A protein has these predicted regions:
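Flexible, solvent-exposed loop/hinge segments and secondary-structure transition points
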Residues: 1-131
Length: 131
């Protein structure tokens, strides 16, 4: 994941939030190893939003799926999530707003967005990715 691409994804997610009238957002892009490449927090976003966005992005690359899909899996198999949450020291966040960044089917990283309702966060992340 290149820095310029990560910054562009963040700018696109925040712009999508502004266009939708979302509450102030935070956005984080991680590489395929879960390391932060870029992040931003809008003025007025609460202090926890960056951590939520990071957890969403990290969850995507850790499990290889978007967090909206993780929500469905948690509901279908809560015992798995409980075990995974313990294994990963609570770093998994089953809340929509995290999307994988792929190129030619290869996972490059993920974008996590937080600040509004999970559905709004997810819409902003999806808009940024261009799906």
């Amino acid at each position: 994941m290149m820095l310029e691409r990560a910054q562009n994804l963040i700018a696109a997610a925040l712009a999508a939030g502004r266009a939708q009238g979302a509450k102030p957002l935070a956005a984080v892009v991680v590489d395929a190893g879960g390391h932060i490449v870029a992040s931003a927090r809008e003025d007025g976003a609460t202090i926890a939003r960056h951590e939520f966005a990071l957890a969403k992005a990290w969850s995507c690359v850790a499990l290889g799926l978007d967090t909206r899909d993780l929500v469905e899996r948690v509901e279908a198999n809560p015992a798995f999530f409980s075990a995974a949450a313990t294994l990963f020291s609570g770093r998994l966040l089953p809340a929509a707003g995290g999307v994988l960044v792929r190129e030619d089917e290869q996972i490059l990283g993920a974008l996590g967005v937080s600040g509004d309702a999970a559905e709004v966060d997810d819409a902003c992340a999806i808009a940024a990715i261009g799906r």
